[in-house]
Amino acid sequence: MTEVRVGKDESLDSALKRFKKKLQEDGVLADIRRHEYYEKPSEKRNRKKAQSKKKK
């Protein structure tokens, strides 16, 4: 669970910015987007193959 504590003199905007950055670093947003719709096993396999080719 991602958690950000707001300091006494810290604005809500800066705390929200830190929270969003932390979510991005933890990969939570990418995970949510990936699970937004059902992905067939064959599509998942094809996506992983494409990613591995992209890395090389």
UniProtKB/Swiss-Prot annotation:
Q: Name one Pfam family in it.
A: Ribosomal_S21
**GO BP of this protein:** translation
Which InterPro entries does the record match to this protein? Answer: Ribosomal_bS21 (IPR001911), Ribosomal_bS21_sf (IPR038380)
GO molecular function terms here?
Answer: structural constituent of ribosome
Q: Does the keyword Iron apply?
A: no
Here the disulfide bonds are none
Q: Where does the signal sequence lie? A: none
Q: Name one GO cellular component term.
A: ribosome
Question: Which keywords fit this entry according to its UniProt record?
Answer: Ribonucleoprotein, Ribosomal protein
Q: Which family does it belong to?
A: Belongs to the bacterial ribosomal protein bS21 family.
The name this protein carries in UniProt is Small ribosomal subunit protein bS21
